[in-house]
């Protein structure tokens, strides 16, 4: 039975963890870090790169480097934004191109192709999958993936689609704050009520949970899927653009390369200001005009940054109030406040959380790793590796249907424990109505038009009758992933129609399967490319060492071997000029064999010319070499 990994698919960074020996372990990437930037790029050679490599080349390739793709997951152009920034406005902030696809889907452009957000997320998941396989030494095909608690149905489905495209069977979608609570509370024996304040790179969640005897029960959750570290960075970027325009009269917002440099500088300055009082933002050659190159050099203080982002921190407290109210708890009843997400390292955030809850936040967990660890624990629960853990999560948003007058009628209210099922009987609005449309909605607004459409389907074949007579039973079923299926049944005829809300990510089953095949093909290409690079590196190093051997030992190498070695080196250099990996491997092997022959010949020659050594006497006296000191050799 293969390992099931836990994945924190983040806006800024992602992580993968696994249970080993009964303990969760965060897996390092091929580059050696447990934090993998959620960045994907296509470079000038048309190669796809993911993670640290992609982030490192972003300044030189801003238009083909995609980051913060999580903010576009499950979103559509022109949809009601709620607390979120409309897609159109968010797209304008990005140096890469975001376009409108079929059915108002969001697409991002890299190279000469456009991709859906689940496809881009799948590339990040493939990187995590590959790193996990290299670490574990076995194939990884199953995963538990975390999402913000406040993700709606479409965003959750988009995440499942991303997993499928990456070749992963997603056993469970788990809320990020719940995962953090699992990691925090797994070894806790006493009953506690905790608040998980999760401010990540792109999203904010607050969850109130009761912990006790291995049971983790979510009492309420609230949040904002468009509030996170990205927004803090954007405040600094906007300030830098305004200051530079005021000082130099140049608008850097029109320059995509400059924007990418500003983003990296803003993120760096923000991180530094968590530990120091001021930092210098120095960007030489940021732009140029008729007078020549221009530089940017500005001092940013912690107090100035706090003034800039105060509204964002305050914005996070409104969902906290909502979550406390929904849970029926007061801040005094919260035993611990757990901080999750890199943005919670900011002193202002910690102070505001302390002021709100009236207690010092718990800093005993790693805010970057705790979600992935919780996902790995949940994976262990599903596989039977972790016992005596019961997780009771909730739905974040109310689910209902549209009824007469465009009203949204709730069937399952927010913060209902899942899995769950709820039925309600409705009737027709007109005499002899032959069919009804079931319009499935998600959201808290009283009118259907202001909520998100999850799906529509028709129930036909209703027998002619006066309005209000037919009885149509509508049933909502939600599984443990928070995924919804809806059934409508005419109680008079027994006729029923069912819809599972699976295409709300904007991708059909066929599209997901096609993308999966493409992703698999790319994985094969990536493996071949890696194999070629490794073969080239081995060949180049061997040729270099062979050339050095020739230079250093020319007088000691027999003439015929000298000629053979030169010939083999030339063959390797010629093979390296082309793209035939097998030719590179073949010539490398031949050169290696030739080098071994040279080594044998040189050492053989040295031994022939060496004087015979006398045996030491029984008394242990030294022979001819007076510089030799006797001593014992002891293995340690």
UniProtKB/Swiss-Prot annotation:
The modification Phosphothreonine is found at residue 203. SUPFAM superfamilies: Actin-like ATPase domain, Heat shock protein 70kD (HSP70), peptide-binding domain. The keyword Ligase does not apply. Residues 618-636 have a biased composition (Basic and acidic residues). PANTHER family: HEAT SHOCK PROTEIN 70KDA. Acts as a chaperone. HAMAP family: DnaK (MF_00332). Belongs to the heat shock protein 70 family. This is Chaperone protein DnaK. The gene is dnaK.
